[in-house]
Regions:
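N-terminal phosphate-binding loop and adjacent alpha-helix
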Residues: 40-79, 103, 109-113
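Short beta-strand-loop/turn "lid" adjacent to the catalytic site in phosphate-handling enzymes
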Residues: 71-117, 143-155
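Short glycine-rich, Thr/Ser-proximal phosphate-binding strand/loop in the N-terminal lobe
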Residues: 17-58, 215
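Intrinsic-disorder-associated, low-complexity terminal segments enriched in Asp/Asn/His/Tyr and depleted
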Residues: 6-7
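Short glycine-aspartate micro-motif
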Residues: 15-20, 81-85, 190-194
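A glycine- and small-aliphatic-rich helix-loop capping segment at beta-alpha/alpha-beta transitions
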Residues: 32-37, 96-108, 134, 152-157, ...
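Glycine-rich phosphate-binding loop plus the immediately following alpha-helix
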Residues: 117-127, 138, 145, 153, ...
Length: 254
């Protein structure tokens, strides 16, 4: 990124950043001047409104317009933005970092293998950024994959362990801790836990998450919206009881 000049062309003025976090029943937005928040809003979506859309991706234009309307009501001109960043979605596995939303990333978000509201984050950001004449980004999506090879092993070769965890929050908290103790994140070994609707517990080794649980599928600790790791034999019996579809069982887990 290039620091913008002030109106006189001399010196610097702060970045104006729009952050967008789409969830299942809300879209949260925030405006920042550099690191200072200047506006934070939660746009609620009722079950009836959501039900109008066959797929989550079909909500894109509707949610984008809600964001733009909310900004307009607060007398904010998107043309003054320096950048837009959205919550990363269920794209292909990538390393931790900030990624520009380009054609390849847009394609991955639109055609994501699993439906999730977070897939809309980068897409909404890109459309608003385009109107503002700036770039759009995502950072540390849940598919961040830095696992050691040994962490991918399970007792069944056909069932390798995969990395899906609360990367954005975990990385941010780890870096904040490093700053607090006066060290670089890349020099520390940490265990970090995200405790929300899902729980992920990860081993951070010198700036990389080398082991974690698949929080999306309910692997790991019991959580408010996840079953946690369940007894394998009982799960097999449940699957073949004839009472439940694959969708039913997946819903039980996560």
């Amino acid at each position: 990124l290039v620091w913008p000049l002030n109106n006189s062309g001399i010196g610097f003025m702060g970045f104006k950043i729009l952050a967008i976090n789409p969830g299942s029943t809300s879209t949260k937005i925030a405006l920042y001047d550099d690191e200072q928040p200047t506006l934070a809003l939660t746009l609620r979506h009722s079950a009836e409104e959501i039900a109008r859309f066959p797929r989550i991706i079909d909500q894109l234009d509707w949610r984008k317009e809600m964001v733009l309307e909310a900004l307009a009501k607060n007398n904010f001109d998107v043309k003054s933005l320096s950048a837009v960043i959205g919550r990363g979605g269920l794209i292909k596995p990538i390393e931790s970092g900030v990624y520009e939303v380009n054609a390849a990333l847009k394609n991955d978000l639109v055609n994501a293998q699993r439906e999730h509201a977070s897939n809309l984050g980068g897409l909404i950001a890109e459309q608003i950024a385009q109107a503002a004449g700036v770039k759009a980004y995502i950072a540390d999506p849940v598919v961040v994959d830095e696992l050691d090879d040994i962490a991918r092993l399970s007792g069944i070769p056909e069932c390798p362990r995969i990395s899906i965890f609360h990367a954005l929050n975990q990385k941010a908290i780890a870096r904040r801790h490093a700053e607090k103790v006066g060290k670089r994140y890349e020099d520390l070994n940490l265990v970090v836990a995200h405790m929300g609707g899902g729980i992920s517990v990860s081993a951070h080794c010198k700036g990389r998450v080398i082991d974690t649980n698949n929080a999306l599928d309910g692997d790991g600790p019991i959580a408010p919206e996840r079953a946690g790791t369940v007894p394998a034999g009982a799960l097999v019996n449940l699957c073949f009881s004839g009472k439940y579809s694959q969708r039913d069982v997946l819903k039980m887990l996560a």
